């Protein structure tokens, strides 16, 4: 079994802290379009930006709820206030993925309305939840939502396509500000391509403001990840070139995680190195899957090296 450094949100707090700066203020509740109402989860932070976006979707009495926030009292209060003031009911609860800032409000929902216990849908559902399948459709007045399986940020991640607006609820795969973190970069890149191929005009992210030009945002995300992969590969190729010049063999210039980080960024504090290591791990495994890098040694002392011709001179077949 391949060794990968486990995803740990605490390591990413430093990495994401810059995304907090200069974030636009979002109202607690906003009728974004005739069909979509956004209700903030009341959980702002480095990982959650202004807080988790939850969405009531539809134009009639019955609405579809996408995500449930983290379980903050302010969220369930804001949601139930909107339901009761407008005579609304929830027909389905759709969860984008398993992370607690998206599923944490489910118990409060069921306390508010026990009938909702049989209307909670998630890919790879927990006990008592209903399964979501790729391509499955959910209907209420004014809204037809199609589920799109897009793993990578999380193994069970789903996006939801709102047909009436040609809009995509992007979950945590694509954010309104900055970039997301991932569990599996190779799978995530495949999902980004699938999302881009849907050609949706607008994006409703799980964190941040509405994405007004989703095709441009998808292109930006894909290019950003590809750029990081090129940077890592270039660092390994530079190390190989230096060692080959002194008579090294096929695995010349192999580097450990700390050595690679030092090669790319120089001396950095330990906490920043910890923040970079999970992301770097995902990049290296993606490059290994693409057969651009190899590795040797036991997991705790694994060393990585470039294989094949340098990227700048590689022959395209």
Swiss-Prot record:
- Which keywords does this Swiss-Prot/TrEMBL entry list? Hydrolase, Metal-binding, Zinc
**Protein's pathway:** Secondary metabolite biosynthesis
> How are cofactors bound according to the entry's free-text note?
Binds 2 Zn(2+) ions per subunit.
Q: Which domain of life is it from?
A: Eukaryota
Gene name per UniProt: adaB
Disulfide linkages recorded for this protein, renumbered to the chain, are none
Which E.C. number(s) belong to this protein?
3.1.-.-
GO molecular function list: hydrolase activity; metal ion binding
Q: Which cofactor does it need?
A: Zn(2+)
Q: What does this protein do?
A: Lactamase-like protein; part of the gene cluster that mediates the biosynthesis of the linear tetracyclic TAN-1612 neuropeptide Y receptor antagonist. The decaketide backbone of TAN-1612 is synthesized by the non-reducing polyketide synthase adaA via condensation of one acetyl-CoA starter unit with 9 malonyl-CoA units. The FAD-dependent monooxygenase adaC then performs hydroxylation at C2 while the polaketide chain is still attached to the NRPKS adaA.
Q: What is this protein called?
A: Lactamase-like protein adaB
Supply the InterPro entries for this chain: LACTB2-like_MBL-fold, Metallo-B-lactamas, RibonucZ/Hydroxyglut_hydro, Sec-metab_biosynth-thioest, WH-like_DNA-bd_sf
